[in-house]
């Protein structure tokens, strides 16, 4: 099984490229954002706790995310690969993830770091907010989310670089152009793991 992390700032195209990987390889997609939005919509205890953080542009605390992911990961055994989108977002989450995966005899194989200029991220997020109606896609919250990313999540680049699994990918261009930059990376690791 191949474990792939899609990494990048809000608006970098993580969800879109995850969909491309699912289509191309049949991987299972785990998006913490989608899981949290579902919890919020269902008004679960986790959803109510997470909503306050998300609406303010803050990261949901590690303990809530790790518990949610641990439950989900334990159900995924017969799959070609897993795409983690939005997890981990902090060093403690990354360390917890390594422990969770190791418990199943797995590891992080590839980290795809989608790199997009900030002005393009803002434009993409504002457009997405108009289309989707997501309340967290307004300029004030976007800037706060980008600051949180720079301060709390970007340090993971160094963390995964030291583990020799990080691959920087230019995240500009068409969806297909970006997917074509990612495919050779994934193909190389699929050959090694088969």
Swiss-Prot record:
Region (NMP) residue spans: 31-60
Q: Name one GO molecular function term.
A: adenylate kinase activity
Q: Which reaction does it catalyse?
A: AMP + ATP = 2 ADP
Localized where? Cytoplasm
Disulfide-bond pairs as recorded: none
Return one Gene Ontology term, BP aspect.
AMP salvage
Pathway per the UniProt entry: Purine metabolism; AMP biosynthesis via salvage pathway; AMP from ADP: step 1/1
| UniProt: ATP binding residues | 11-16, 128, 173
Keyword field contains ATP-binding: yes
- Provide the primary localization: cytoplasm
Q: Which PANTHER family match?
A: NUCLEOTIDE KINASE
Q: What is this protein called?
A: Adenylate kinase
What lineage does UniProt assign to this protein's organism?
Answer: Bacteria, Pseudomonadati, Bacteroidota, Bacteroidia, Bacteroidales
